Curated annotation (Swiss-Prot):
Changing K224A: No effect on protein stability. Drastically increased protein stability and decreased ubiquitination. It is found in: Lipid droplet; Endoplasmic reticulum; Nucleus. Lipid transferase specifically expressed in white adipose tissue, which promotes unilocular lipid droplet formation by mediating lipid droplet fusion. Lipid droplet fusion promotes their enlargement, restricting lipolysis and favoring lipid storage. Localizes on the lipid droplet surface, at focal contact sites between lipid droplets, and mediates atypical lipid droplet fusion by undergoing liquid-liquid phase separation (LLPS) and promoting directional net neutral lipid transfer from the smaller to larger lipid droplets. Residues 41-118 form the CIDE-N domain. It holds the Pfam family CIDE-N. The lineage of its organism: Eukaryota, Metazoa, Chordata, Craniata, Vertebrata. Disulfide bonds: none annotated. The keyword Endoplasmic reticulum applies. This is Lipid transferase CIDEC. Changing K182A: Abolishes lipid droplet enlargement activity, but not localization to lipid droplets, nor enrichement at contact sites. Disruption phenotype: Mutant animals are born in a Mendelian ratio and appear physically normal at birth. Mice display increased energy expenditure, lower levels of plasma triglycerides and free fatty acids. The body weights of wild-type and mutant mice fed a standard diet do not differ up to 14 weeks of age, nor does food intake. From 16 weeks of age, the body weight of mutant mice significantly decreases compared with that of wild-type mice. When animals are fed a high-fat diet, the gain in body weight is significantly smaller for mutant mice than for wild-type.
Length: 239
């Protein structure tokens, strides 16, 4: 009878809750008594490429974490690389050395075949490369520009401005207005007439210069022939 009463008392909710509370307290005390291993805090790091053109800021807990994040950020999957200090090129290989470094330490990623170089040497090489790629100064001998525009939206073609520049010093421009079909023909005839007049002036100038040159050569030939004709006459008189 006593055994049955004890069994019923154990099944009573108050005693059951008391046993659960005691068990929870024991488990909690055991968990607290066990020494917990502290995880290192994330530290800020800066990483650059070998040419110092790309720089990234990364938060990493350990050296392995930093290497994994560098591989993901710089897309270096399946590419062997090493991590060195940016200031002097010291290789960072152990976790102890990584944890001993100061915060915001600048690291450099070197791929296979790349070597660490001081910043001064890289600046010198960049300056030489910039000077070698500097374009040489060019002088325009002649430049012709065409500008087509409309003064009225209803114009057939519009207006054409032709500008010619020689050695960036002498310039000549002509404005051709094209309003209607008849006006276009008139402007074309006017331009043709202007070209013919200019060509005629050039031909006249050239022909007059050639005429003067021919006249000068013809006057020199009789002058040379006169002394040769006087010599036989003098010989006859002496005989």
């Amino acid at each position: 009878m006593d055994y049955a009463m004890k069994s019923l008392s154990l099944l009573y909710p108050r005693s059951l809750s008391r046993h659960v509370a005691v068990s929870t307290a024991v488990v909690t005390q055991q968990l607290v008594s066990k020494p917990s291993r502290e995880t290192p805090r994330a530290r800020p790091c800066r990483v650059s490429t070998a040419d110092r053109k790309v720089r990234k800021g990364i938060m990493a807990h350990s050296l392995e974490d930093l290497l994994n994040k560098v591989q993901d950020i710089l897309k270096l999957k399946d590419k062997p690389f090493s991590l060195v200090l940016e200031e002097d090129g010291t290789i960072v290989e152990t976790e102890e050395y990584f944890q001993a470094l100061a915060k915001d330490t600048m690291f450099m990623v070197l791929l296979k075949g790349q070597k660490w170089k001081p910043p001064s040497e890289q600046r010198k090489k960049r300056a030489q490369l910039a000077l070698s790629q500097k374009p040489t100064k060019k002088i325009d001998v002649a430049r012709v520009t065409f500008d087509l525009y409309k003064l009225n939206p209803q114009d057939f073609i519009g207006c054409l401005n032709v500008k010619a520049t020689l050695y960036d010093t002498y310039s000549l421009s002509y404005d051709l207005h094209c309003y209607k079909a008849k006006r276009i023909v008139k402007e074309m005839l006017r331009w043709t007439l202007f070209s013919m007049q200019a060509t005629g002036h050039m031909l006249l100038g050239t022909s007059s210069y050639m005429q003067q040159f021919l006249d000068a050569t013809e006057e020199e030939q009789p002058a040379k022939a006169k002394p040769s004709s006087l010599l036989p006459a003098c010989l006859k008189m002496l005989q």
